[in-house]
Every structure is written in structure tokens, then in C-alpha cells.
């Protein structure tokens, strides 16, 4: 889960109330969060707080403050209100990353802590919601340095000329300048081969090159009070969500929308979802007797707005920043959090079941026992493998957001793992006799998740004079133990995977 660092003094300043570390930890725990680490410094305490992956609104101290203001003090959470304006961005790019949204925050007063929090929140949104800028990227600019209107367009790489963030010298080749930069270089993969996508103001100054870097000319600082926030990406919903999040956390009384004009005018849509909820539904799931008024109070403490219809029903409005709410079940979960899980009566379920071991796991354990009695040692290898190692992977499931080349695909055979185990233990005495019982994954269009699991047994023998009978014998024993009598061994002509005339 993502974590945020919050200074004790700053969060207490935002909340308007002081808590000792133990009390604050209990408050967060009851809310569904957890302090991962408490770092004591000479003049302050820093809390490292684990945030659920779907609560993007809590990834900064300001967003956490708004949530706790409602939870602790029952303060009604107000959604953001954007005023209309004459600020305009002309969209002339309609290819990759054509989704654009923008807004302006006016009269925001930064201090060092809130400025650092603003920059950190921007990066966390791009990293989590934006999948490391592959789906969404965000740029923030000093409004007072921009000449309007602004154009979002594609230019040839030879036309690029600007000073990147924290650089005073102008450059005309991003790839050459940032190819060895560990922080910026990883985003160059999202740039087109022949063109750069840029925001350019009326005087021809480049504001940013999404999703790589902003211009140093429009860099914001602690003294910046008026901020342009622009968000681009491949998905309109995620682009709008990302913009709503940062506007909500760093709100002022003077925020305005930026008109995106292409073939039609596009305005940032902030639509609130609503649900009709009854106390009977809450009782069914949580087994608590509660009045509709008390239910309304609980929901308000979890940032919702309510409208009581009658003594059993109320309408619940979900604020736009609560993108984690997808179903009534999420509302009921929040009710349980606010009510307190320890306050819910525990009852025995109406249906009693007798637990038993899964039949497949039971059979797998018996196979393991037989293989061990045959002199083989069990190994456990990685389920994720590289594409090059997954030689049986013609129909394998590939990981879309892998962290390393060793974790590109889900294994479709146990064989590569066994070979790696041997290669890592060549110092051991021979013969080496190892086996593994484990799941492999294949793509399957008929499955509801697009793939299916299969449980495989694989064994490997290494010796000075290895022969086919060294593994054929154990396999014969296993087949007979399983009651399989009608089987035969055939030659297997696959020179990619086995030596010629050495497989069956």
C-alpha cells in the first residue's frame, strides 16, 4: 500500500486539535488506516501512514485532514466549486494522450510544508492513479508567467526549444538530455518517435512536454499564489479524477475552470453519484438497529451528504473525490467503520459448514509424499518469470505493469524454475533429484478472468550418467499409485526444449 509522511505538528495545525501519538494511532486505526512507523525527531514527530490503494484522496496531509474533520467532528464535507472563466486551452492534438483537463487555483498561500505536500501529492497521483504516468500525467505552473490562450498540440522534435524544470539552459532534444536520468529517463518511453506533445502559450513559450517534464519558466515556488493545473492522459475518467483530487485537497474560495476547446468545448465534469439506502439493508449486512437520523450522522462523518426521505430511507450523495465508492456495499462498509467494528454484535451464522481440506491440495500433498519417498527433494520456485525463460509460454499470461524483467509473465511450466534451481546449486553433490508441485497459468478466452490455473508435477534428475529411466521410473511409480494403468511413453521431437532423441 502507498504511504505518506505527515508531521505531527502540521496535521494538528490542520485539525485544530492536539493528540498524543497513541491516541492518534488509535483514531487512524479505527478509520481504517495504520501508522507504519513513528519517527521521533529533535523538534517534531513524523508519522508514516499506510493508505489504502483506492483512497487517492488521502495521499496527502491536506486530504487526510478533510477526511478526519468529518470523521472526528462531524463537519459536512463540501465538494469543490469551480467558477467559469475566460481561460482557454485550444486542443489541436488528437492522437496519443489526447484527453485534457485543466483548472486554476487562485490565492493559495504556501508554506514550506504545504508546498512540499503539493509536489508530493502530484507525484503520488501520477504514480498510483496514473500508473507511473503511463495513463495520466500532471503539470503545475505559475499562472502569472503564462500568456493566454494556451495550445495543446504536437510539434516535430526538431522544433523543440525550452529549458526543462530546474535547468537554466535551453535544450532541443529530450532523449539526449535525459537518457541517463533515473527519474526522468523512464518516462521517455511514452514519447512518440517523431513528435513531442506540448502545451504552448500565446507567445510561443513551451509550458510542458507531457508526460516527461515541465518548463523551468513556469516553475512554481513557495511564493506562487496562482497555479494552473493541467492533466493529460489516455483515459478521460482518470484525467478528470486526478484533477478533482488535487483541487479538492488544495482548495481555495477562488478556483476556476479552464475551457478546453477543440471541435467542441469541453468542460470539466464533476458529477456526484447517489444511492438510495434503507436501514433494512444496513441491518441485513451489519446486524445493527439504527434510526435513519443516526445513520445519516454516520454517513456525514464519512464525507457523504444525505437527504432523509422517510423513517426508513435516505438518499446518499457521494462526493467526487470518493472514487473508491462503486456500490452500496462500500457505503455499508463505511457505516461499519464509523459505527465501530467492536460495537457490532457478533452472532453465529445461520448456515454452519464443516471445514475440510481442498481435494486438489490433498492430492498434491500425497504426490509430494510419494516423490519424497522416491528420493527427490521438493523445491518452490517463482511463479513470475521472464519471457525468455518461459520457453513453454506460447499461451502464457503477461504482466502489464511488471517491476523487473524477471517478472514479465506468469509461468506456464514448472520446468524453467527447476532448471534455475539446478543452475543456482551447481556446487552441490550429484546426483541432484528435485521436484515441484505447483500451479501454472494459461490464457483462456472462455474463462471469466481470461486465464485458467492448472496444477502440475515436474521432476528433474542431474547425474554423471543421466538416462531417461532415471525419471521414467519415478513417473511410472506415481502413475501406478494414482491408479493409471493405460499409459505409454512416446518420443518427443522438440529440439527447442529437449536434446534430440533424449525426450519422451
Curated annotation (Swiss-Prot):
Cellular component GO terms, alphabetical: phenylalanine-tRNA ligase complex
Q: Name one GO molecular function term.
A: RNA binding
Cofactor(s) it depends on:
Mg(2+)
Query: Which residues of this UniProt protein bind Mg(2+)?
Result: 324, 330, 333-334
Family matches, as Pfam families: B3_4 (PF03483), B5 (PF03484), PhetRS_B1 (PF18262), tRNA_synthFbeta (PF17759)
Where is it chiefly localized? cytoplasm
Q: Does the keyword Protein biosynthesis apply?
A: yes
Q: Which NCBIfam families match?
A: pheT_arch
Name of the protein in its database record: Probable phenylalanine--tRNA ligase beta subunit
Question: What species was this sequence derived from?
Answer: Vairimorpha ceranae (strain BRL01)
Amino acid at each position: 500500500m502507498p504511504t505518506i509522511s505527515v508531521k505531527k505538528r502540521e496535521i494538528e495545525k490542520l485539525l485544530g486539535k492536539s493528540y498524543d501519538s497513541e491516541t492518534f494511532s488509535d483514531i487512524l486505526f479505527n478509520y481504517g488506516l495504520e501508522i507504519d512507523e513513528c519517527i521521533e525527531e529533535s523538534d517534531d514527530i513524523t508519522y508514516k501512514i499506510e493508505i489504502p490503494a483506492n483512497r487517492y484522496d488521502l495521499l496527502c496531509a491536506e486530504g487526510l485532514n478533510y477526511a478526519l474533520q468529518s470523521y472526528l467532528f462531524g463537519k459536512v464535507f463540501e465538494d469543490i466549486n469551480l467558477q467559469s472563466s475566460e481561460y482557454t486551452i485550444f486542443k489541436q492534438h488528437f492522437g496519443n494522450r489526447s484527453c485534457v483537463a485543466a483548472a486554476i487555483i487562485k490565492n493559495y498561500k504556501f508554506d514550506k510544508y504545504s508546498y512540499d505536500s503539493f509536489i508530493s501529492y502530484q507525484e503520488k497521483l501520477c504514480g498510483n492513479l496514473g500508473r507511473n504516468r503511463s495513463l495520466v500525467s500532471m503539470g503545475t505552473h505559475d499562472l502569472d508567467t503564462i500568456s493566454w490562450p494556451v495550445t495543446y498540440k504536437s510539434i516535430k522534435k526538431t522544433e523543440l526549444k525550452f529549458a526543462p524544470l530546474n535547468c537554466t539552459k535551453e535544450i532541443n532534444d529530450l532523449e539526449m538530455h535525459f537518457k541517463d536520468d533515473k527519474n526522468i529517463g523512464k518516462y521517455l518511453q511514452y514519447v512518440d518517435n517523431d513528435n513531442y506533445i506540448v502545451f504552448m502559450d500565446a507567445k510561443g513559450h513551451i509550458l510542458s512536454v507531457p508526460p516527461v517534464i515541465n518548463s523551468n519558466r513556469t516553475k512554481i515556488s513557495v511564493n506562487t499564489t496562482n497555479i494552473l493545473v493541467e492533466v493529460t492522459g489516455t483515459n478521460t475518467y482518470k484525467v478528470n479524477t486526478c484533477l478533482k483530487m488535487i483541487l479538492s485537497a488544495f482548495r481555495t474560495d477562488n478556483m476556476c475552470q479552464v475551457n478546453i476547446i477543440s471541435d467542441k468545448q469541453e468542460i470539466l465534469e464533476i458529477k456526484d453519484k447517489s444511492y438510495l439506502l434503507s436501514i433494512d439493508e444496513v441491518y441485513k449486512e451489519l446486524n445493527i438497529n439504527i434510526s435513519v437520523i443516526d445513520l445519516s450522522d454516520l454517513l456525514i462523518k464519512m464525507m457523504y451528504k444525505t437527504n432523509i426521505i422517510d423513517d426508513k430511507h435516505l438518499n446518499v450523495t457521494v462526493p467526487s473525490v470518493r472514487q473508491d465508492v462503486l456500490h452500496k456495499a462500500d457505503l455499508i462498509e463505511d457505516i461499519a467503520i464509523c459505527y465501530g467494528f467492536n460495537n457490532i454484535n457478533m452472532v453465529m451464522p445461520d448456515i454452519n459448514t464443516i471445514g475440510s481440506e481442498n481435494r486438489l491440495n490433498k492430492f498434491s500433498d500425497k504426490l509430494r509424499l510419494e516423490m519424497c519417498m522416491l528420493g527427490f527433494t521438493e523445491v518452490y520456485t517463482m511463479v513470475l518469470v521472464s519471457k525468455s525463460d518461459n520457453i513453454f509460454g506460447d499461451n502464457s499470461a503477461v504482466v502489464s505493469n511488471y517491476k523487473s524483467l524477471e517478472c514479465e509473465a506468469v509461468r506456464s511450466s514448472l520446468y524453467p524454475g527447476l532448471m534455475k534451481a539446478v543452475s543456482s546449486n551447481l556446487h552441490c553433490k550429484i546426483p541432484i533429484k528435485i521436484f515441484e508441485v505447483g500451479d501454472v497459468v494459461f490464457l483462456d478466452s472462455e474463462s471469466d478472468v481470461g486465464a485458467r490455473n492448472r496444477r502440475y508435477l515436474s521432476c528433474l534428475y542431474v547425474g554423471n550418467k543421466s538416462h531417461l529411466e532415471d525419471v521414467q521410473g519415478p513417473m511410472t511409480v506415481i502413475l501406478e499409485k494414482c491408479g493409471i494403468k493405460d499409459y505409454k511413453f512416446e518420443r518427443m521431437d522438440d529440439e527447442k526444449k529437449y536434446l534430440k532423441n533424449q525426450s519422451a
